[in-house]
């Protein structure tokens, strides 16, 4: 067994690409080696801003020989009068064997020729020499560039290549912007701390050799070092570090030899909102903020991660202190200047901000958000006070976009709106809604907690969805430039989390009609929006609510045919899906599945409308020939109030109890001593019996379409 090393040395790589490349190689390379019969005992992928590396231990020196059986032509086509035909000769030539190697064997289709063909395994060095370039250039990332005259693309120019199998060099040549890069044993140390070339004698020496050259190649080790140093620096200034996982991941891939350096600034800057200070530190400067040991009060300190000389930490600290002072001084100026007038007076300036080229300004969007918010408030039957709060919050929700602070720090939209609203004397409910209406900002982000914030958030996203759909810019595949999937997901999650009794279908109809009146040349189709929300419902129910796919189909329809019903009552759709999952788990579904499903399948041969529940008027007892029909009919009469109660109160337990109780009667109807032939020759008898089955199907349909459910 051998140890294999590949190191690709480059110009400074973007941190996001290094992290992505490591994940890609961790996924792809083990599969590639296994496919080529060179599975190692262990494989690690390393990465820094200047290199990507693979270290595989326990790699076979050579592929194993492989013997495969190849089926040839029929014997009667391969031989004529005992002599090989051209077909036999061609097959032998193609497989690299001789006629004497043929084996005749009987099969179900007659006698055929077979040969045993052995392929000799290649040395690992030769296989790796072919694979390595494909691994390098299969990496994907943003803004790749061509670094030579050919089609070769990579994130940054490749400067060196180390490729070893034990102490043997694997010969590789790559075309690059500076010519041809040939593999050798020479790597590079830290650009500042160890600029001299580094020789790698054996792959097993790689990590230790680079560490001596001030490069920690293992990102997990670098991250551990960073966390330890950051905590130590914070403790030294009697505070605790605020470590964001995103920032920690980013700085891990920005440095090769991390050194945490603490810096400070004047306490007067702490009068700024904490969000302004931390945004400048984290998003712009990649600093870790420092808080008081107890509570969340910021201290006038920060911690930066240097990739330079630890001996020069004082100089590094001073330089960063100058930067943060200047940035926070700008923040002080913006904060004071923005409060020179009330937040509401910024509204006219929104005319200068374009929402979308064909859709006008953000000021016009605000008017649409207000209208949407009032429709939501009306549906929820809110009192006048809360409705007025909703209207005012919707009016002010985008006003901070034209403040100087948000112009400098776009990440603070909504946050500064809340601060400025309070400073302007707006009620807390309105100020909070301004910041909350942007929530959630991502898949795992928190949701708005106040009713006003929830309503304005829904109204804003409804406008975005209807407007962009009106332009025909419907998301396709992975392309979703306006984040419409995220917007629809947010609406559904807000409704579910807050248990808002909303008719989303009606809201889509109202907002679409209003949009069409405002923009006559753009006509969004409500059905397209329904279908889109149906896709999001399906995804959320399966992926986040962990509902089985067939139970989701039972609620939405296998082709989305029940989506509109769910949009009319989104809470009910979720509750039905969850209840179906519950009764599958506890076994209740199995007790009614066969009966209901059989009835539903046969009922398709009838013409009873799916919303009919009362047997009176659609079933004629005078036509009954067997007692099982009467018992079935009586069971439906008993089931009716239980189903109606389930519809009005969403108490589907009563419905399932009723279906469980009627199941034996239906089984008797089908298979008992007094069973009947449903598809009778007499048309009236046939229709009467199909209506009985159709009624049972309809009662079950109140919970879900049992025809879509797969038997457990």
Swiss-Prot record:
Query: Is Lipid metabolism included in the keywords of this UniProt record?
Result: no
**Per the record, what are the reactions this protein catalyses?**
tRNA(Gly) + glycine + ATP = glycyl-tRNA(Gly) + AMP + diphosphate
Q: Which PANTHER family match?
A: GLYCINE--TRNA LIGASE, CHLOROPLASTIC_MITOCHONDRIAL 2, GLYCYL-TRNA SYNTHETASE
Which InterPro entries did the record assign? Gly-tRNA-synth_bsu, Gly-tRNA-synth_heterodimer
Q: What class of enzyme is it?
A: ligase
Q: Name one GO molecular function term.
A: ATP binding
Q: Which UniProt keywords apply?
A: Aminoacyl-tRNA synthetase, ATP-binding, Cytoplasm, Ligase, Nucleotide-binding, Protein biosynthesis
GO CC terms in record: cytosol
Name the Enzyme Commission number(s) assigned to this protein. Answer: 6.1.1.14
**Signal peptide, first to last residue:** none
Subunit record text: Tetramer of two alpha and two beta subunits.
Compartments it resides in: Cytoplasm
Task: Give the family per the record.
Answer: Belongs to the class-II aminoacyl-tRNA synthetase family.
According to UniProt, the name of this protein is: Glycine--tRNA ligase beta subunit
Q: Which Pfam families match?
A: tRNA_synt_2f
Its BP terms in the Gene Ontology are: glycyl-tRNA aminoacylation
Q: Which gene encodes it?
A: glyS
């Amino acid at each position: 067994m051998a140890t294999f090393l590949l190191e690709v040395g480059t110009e400074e790589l973007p941190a996001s690409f290094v992290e992505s490349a490591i994940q890609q190689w961790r996924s792809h390379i083990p599969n590639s080696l296994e496919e080529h019969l060179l599975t190692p005992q262990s494989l690690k992928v390393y990465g820094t801003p200047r290199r990507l590396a693979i270290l595989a231990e326990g790699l076979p020196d050579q592929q194993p020989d492989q013997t495969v059986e190849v089926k040839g032509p029929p014997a009667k086509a391969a031989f004529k009068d005992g002599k090989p035909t051209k077909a036999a000769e061609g097959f032998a030539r193609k497989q690299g064997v001789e006629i004497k190697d043929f084996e005749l064997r009987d099969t179900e289709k007659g006698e055929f020729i077979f040969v045993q063909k052995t392929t000799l395994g290649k040395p690992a060095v030769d296989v790796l020499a072919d694979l390595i370039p494909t691994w390098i250039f299969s990496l994907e990332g943003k803004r790749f560039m061509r670094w030579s005259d050919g089609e070769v693309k990579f994130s940054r120019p490749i400067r060196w290549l180390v490729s070893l199998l034990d102490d043997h060099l694997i010969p590789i040549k790559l075309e690059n912007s500076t010519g041809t890069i040939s593999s050798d044993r020479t790597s590079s140390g830290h650009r500042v701390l160890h600029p001299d070339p580094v020789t790698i004698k054996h792959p097993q020496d790689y990590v230790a050799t680079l560490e001596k050259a001030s490069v920690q190649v293992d990102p997990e080790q670098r991250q551990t070092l960073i966390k330890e140093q950051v905590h130590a620096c914070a403790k030294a200034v009697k505070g605790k570090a605020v470590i964001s996982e995103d920032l920690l991941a980013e700085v891990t891939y920005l440095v090769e030899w991390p050194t945490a350096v603490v810096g400070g600034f004047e306490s007067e800057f702490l009068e700024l909102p904490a969000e302004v200070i931390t945004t400048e530190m984290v998003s712009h400067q990649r600093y870790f903020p420092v808080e008081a040991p107890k509570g969340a009060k910021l201290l006038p300190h920060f911690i930066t991660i240097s990739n330079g000389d630890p001996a020069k930490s004082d100089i590094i600290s001073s330089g960063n202190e100058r930067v943060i002072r200047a940035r926070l001084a700008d923040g002080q100026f913006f904060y004071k200047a923005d409060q020179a007038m009330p937040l509401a007076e910024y509204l006219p300036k929104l005319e200068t901000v374009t929402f979308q080229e064909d859709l006008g300004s953000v000021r016009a969007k605000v008017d649409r958000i207000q209208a949407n918010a009032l429709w939501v408030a009306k549906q929820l039957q809110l009192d006048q006070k809360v409705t007025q709060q909703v209207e005012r919050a919707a009016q002010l929700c985008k006003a901070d976009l034209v403040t100087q602070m948000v112009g400098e720090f776009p990440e603070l939209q909504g946050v500064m709106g809340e601060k400025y609203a309070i400073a302007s004397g707006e009620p807390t409910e309105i100020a909070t809604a301004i910041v909350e209406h942007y929530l959630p900002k991502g898949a795992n982000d928190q949701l708005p907690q106040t009713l006003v914030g929830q309503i304005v958030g829904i109204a804003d996203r409804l406008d975005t969805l209807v407007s962009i759909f009106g332009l025909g810019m419907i998301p396709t595949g992975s392309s979703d430039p306006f984040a419409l999937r995220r917007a629809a997901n947010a609406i559904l999650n807000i409704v579910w989390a807050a248990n808002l009794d909303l008719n989303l279908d009606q809201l889509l109809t109202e907002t679409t009609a209003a949009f069409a009146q405002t923009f006559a040349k753009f006509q969004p189709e409500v059905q397209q929006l329904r279908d889109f929300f149906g896709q999001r419902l399906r995804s959320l129910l399966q992926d986040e609510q962990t509902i089985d796919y067939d139970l989701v189909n039972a609620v939405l329809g296998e082709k989305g045919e029940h989506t509109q019903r769910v949009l009319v009552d989104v809470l009910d759709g979720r509750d039905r899906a969850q209840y179906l999952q519950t009764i599958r788990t506890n076994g209740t579904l199995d007790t009614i599945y066969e009966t209901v499903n059989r009835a539903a399948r046969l009922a398709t041969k009838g013409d009873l409308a799916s919303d009919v529940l009362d047997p009176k008027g659609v079933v004629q007892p005078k036509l009954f020939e067997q007692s099982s029909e009467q018992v079935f009919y009586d069971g439906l009469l008993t089931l009716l109030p239980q189903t109606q109660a389930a519809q009005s109160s969403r108490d589907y337990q009563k419905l399932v109890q009723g279906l469980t109780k009627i199941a034996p009667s239906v089984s008797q109807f089908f298979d008992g001593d007094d069973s009947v032939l449903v598809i009778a020759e007499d048309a009236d008898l046939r229709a009467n019996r199909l209506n009985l089955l159709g009624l049972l199907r309809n009662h079950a349909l109140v919970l879900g379409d049992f025809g879509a459910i797969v038997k457990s």
